[in-house]
Amino acid sequence: MMRILLFVATNLAVVLVASITLSLFGFNGFMAANGVDLNLGQLLVFCAVFGFAGSLVSLFISKWMAKMTTGTQIITQPRTRHEQWLLQTVEELSREAGIKMPEVGIFPAYEANAFATGWNRNDALVAVSQGLLERFSPDEVRAVLAHEIGHVANGDMVTMALVQGVVNTFVMFFARIIGNFVDRVIFKNEEGHGIAYFVATIVAELVLGILASIIVMWYSRRREFRADEAGAHLAGTGAMIGALQRLRSEQGLPVHMPDTMKAFGINGGLKHGLAGLLMSHPPLEDRIDALRRRG
């Protein structure tokens, strides 16, 4: 909770600074001179409220959504040796990472994958695919679990939601400024918001949304490297590299995880170049190389 409060306070300060900066550079005067009566401070607050609302709601219901969309079955009483080993391993790794034991689940999928989610590092969910549990060696599965526990310990789910809230805020803010400018200055509309405002705002949100996604995915790729480091610390560098190499050997298999959960899975990062800018995971080769350099 302290992480959320500090992050929200920081970003409210960013909103305030942005509003003051635009005023100092005469942006308000420029818009007013062209017939646009726009209170940038109020607009920023409005956009911040709605920008953060969606991402924070998604964060708070993330465990429920993950269970629903992936078909994850929570293990309450282990029925097999696989389930017993899984619970014991997650409990051990959680203790080493200094977090409370998360819920542990298995979702039905042949491909090897796993994810962690939850609004709080002490109220999380870690789930693995049936394929990972059945086809990978215990050391490989343990390394994958250590990676996911690393995400939880680092508070990545919370930070991702808050980063998304920030970019949502500024996408909405600048899209509405552009919409007002096009409507009032270019189309000379003086009576409320004309059709040009709505069209320009939607187009601006689409374009700015793509640019914002590049920022969010850049951060997502950075957190994967950090989770790999945490996994190496908990399970051993050799085991973490071995798990990533095994995942690399299975690239190309269809992934049945919903799009909303792919950013929180361990497997991903097939594309390079411009397409790679919108990938939530770095290429596995880059992650393996980073661990080798770490030693």
From Swiss-Prot:
* The protein, known as: Protease HtpX
Record localization: Cell inner membrane
Residues spanning the membrane: 4-24, 41-61, 158-178, 198-218
Is the keyword Cell division assigned to this protein?
no
Q: Which CDD domains match?
A: M48B_HtpX_like
Q: Does the keyword Protease apply?
A: yes
Which InterPro entries does this one have?
Answer: HtpX_protease (IPR050083), Pept_M48_protease_HtpX (IPR022919), Peptidase_M48 (IPR001915)
Gene Ontology, cellular component aspect: plasma membrane
